[in-house]
Amino acid sequence: MPFDLDAYRAQAEAFLSDTDREYYLHYSGQRDEFEIEAVFDRHANLFTHEAAGSLREAGAPGPLIEFAVEGHIGRETRALSAELARREAALEIEWNGASIPFRSAAVLEANEPDPERRAELDAARNELTETELNPLLRELLDSSHAITRDLGWPSLQALCEELSGIDLAELGRQTDAFLEATDSRYEELVEPQLRKQVGMGFDGLRRSDLPPFFRAPSLDAGFPAERLVPSLTETLEEMGIEVSGQRGVTIDTVPRPKKSPRAFCSPVRVPDEVYLVISPVGGREDYAALFHEAGHTEHYAHIDPGLPVENRYRGDNSVTEAYAFLFEHLTSDPAWLRRRLGIDDPQPIVDYGRASKLVYQRRYAAKLGYELELNGGGDVDGLEQLYARRLSEALRVQWPGAQWLADVDPFFYSARYLRAWALETHLHRALTERFGESWFAEPEAGRFLRDLWSTGQGPEGGEGILARAGGGSLDFSVLLSDLG
């Protein structure tokens, strides 16, 4: 009996909808329970070894096979993942005369003004990661690699390259070239911003000093809480998107005690039910997070409902991340800052935005090269040294090897972010060339984006979006233009 691809797609969509609804209800503070395991149990037949094999034999699109394979690996390792989450939630750190939850340490680190106390907290985090979490993370990694081989691929890299259509090795060469090309400008662009935000340059800088650098509280005054949501709705409305009556989109601003403090997007039914969840606080970081998630929201809300599930929910996530970056980077765009927030001299924010983005890009470029070694099918023993060396050299800070397993994006999602930065740069260039520096205030730019959004995530992925936007090659070297 031939494999019923339509039935599989229908159940896959039901699963994705159920999981995103669970995510929305829990993290918006409406439900204490997070019953994700029950969702997996209801749809367990989607993720069997046989389902993955049948999809391959039926010649199903890569993103649909990718969905089945990732789900199969996740299902087979769910006990390890659950134990890891339980152990992490139970861990506490003795710091500053008190016991604090392990998961709260990152936030405390970002807001701690004393660099020595930050370093003590970071050292305690690394020690617990090494002793309590890494043994489980190593077991999880080894199990994932074994399941990958059992499915017929020699390595996780080979699996991801075949199913995503992304040449990860070539992207690794491009990002290594980016590291080399930006090496001489890195300290010049970043050090002044480090001194402004954390009071020190690269001499004496530790990893624990980077969270407050990314927090950048000195810039918060220009980003008031009362303008957070209006600045977004006004931007969208000038592009011809009437948010108040937009079909399928709910902007959830209701205060709830257990609501996530960070904005997020839940595409429950694409494009008919998409939630943008906000807890308006204000500050530069809050604006950036909201606009990032708004980019996802508008993309999902405008996707053609007739597209198959793999092109509405799955496909090349470089695409939706590019739209998210496009909106996020408005919060460091001088024309937008003047127009929407009335900032007369936006240059300090622009300079900080350029520096922080370069740190992120070099970090992910260094991480990709390491992850190619980690998931390339070879022996992983000793790779913590490679991880520490690549990150230390890229960021000019002594990076701890203890994070070599915790700081890994599943299924090379780091590559999606890297490609998204390149695609966003191309899109921004196309928008400014067609509609001017204030493209975000032009209805024609809104129509241009809605046309792109309607195509979903595929089937040609980021390359297809770039072709529709005006052509060119999705080459990571385009990011060099950001450096002036």
Where are these regions (language model features)?
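N-terminal helix-rich structural modules
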Residues: 1-131
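C-terminal, non-catalytic "cap/extension" segments appended to globular domains
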Residues: 20, 26-31, 42-58, 155-158, ...
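Contiguous, non-catalytic segments that form substrate-binding/exosite surfaces or channel walls
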Residues: 81, 123-275, 281-284, 467, ...
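Core structural elements
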Residues: 99-114, 143-156, 205, 392-393, ...
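Post-HExxH zinc-binding segment in Zn-dependent metallohydrolases
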Residues: 175-185, 303, 314-352
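Active-site-adjacent bridging/hinge elements
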Residues: 203-209, 261-273, 294-304, 339-346, ...
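Active-site recognition of the HExxH zinc-binding catalytic motif
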Residues: 282-304, 321-325
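Active-site metal-coordination segments of metallo-dependent hydrolases
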Residues: 309-323, 356-359, 409-419
